[in-house]
Amino acid sequence: AASDVYKRQDLKIVRIMPNTPALVKESMSAVMPNEFISKEELDEVLVILNSFGKTEVVSEKLIDGVIAVSGSSPAYVFMMIEAMGDAAVASGLDRKRAYKFAAQAVLGSAKMVLETGMHPGELKDMVCSPKGTTIEAVKKLEEYGFRSALIKAMEACEKKSKEMSK
């Protein structure tokens, strides 16, 4: 198993889980050095990884959860942007602009989470006016299990990752 190799004393290993936004220098890479990597060696690795995004050093035991929340999540976001675009096209926008609006909304929302330090739920609540359009959409997302679907999908991803590492 991968975990057995990771513990070999004769090997210096840094396990890395980047994601596809590395293609636009926006990767979020999990970095898991084994105990035989020096701080200087780790710093060299981080310089390379930070050249195409952000990094976070995490424990090896968290890899499966990291894969679900970061390694695989660009696919979930792409699906959401595609669905948002489809809905916008159905309401009259051309596809190119529909995707542009959807993608920019996702990008800006992500930046708000990262830069404000506010809880995502609090940020969501700031958009929802009483009896407004957004709260109606949020109610439908809850009715159709949006959050539950994401959680279940990530649990399945984590489970599959654990199975594949055996």
Positions of predicted regions on the chain:
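Short, small-residue-biased leader/transition segments that mark boundaries at the very start
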Residues: 1-6
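NAD(P)-dependent Rossmann-like dehydrogenase/reductase catalytic/cofactor-binding core
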Residues: 103-166
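A generic short alpha-helical patch detector that favors 3-5-residue windows
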Residues: 72-76, 100-101, 126-129
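Short beta-strand segments
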Residues: 15-17, 32, 128
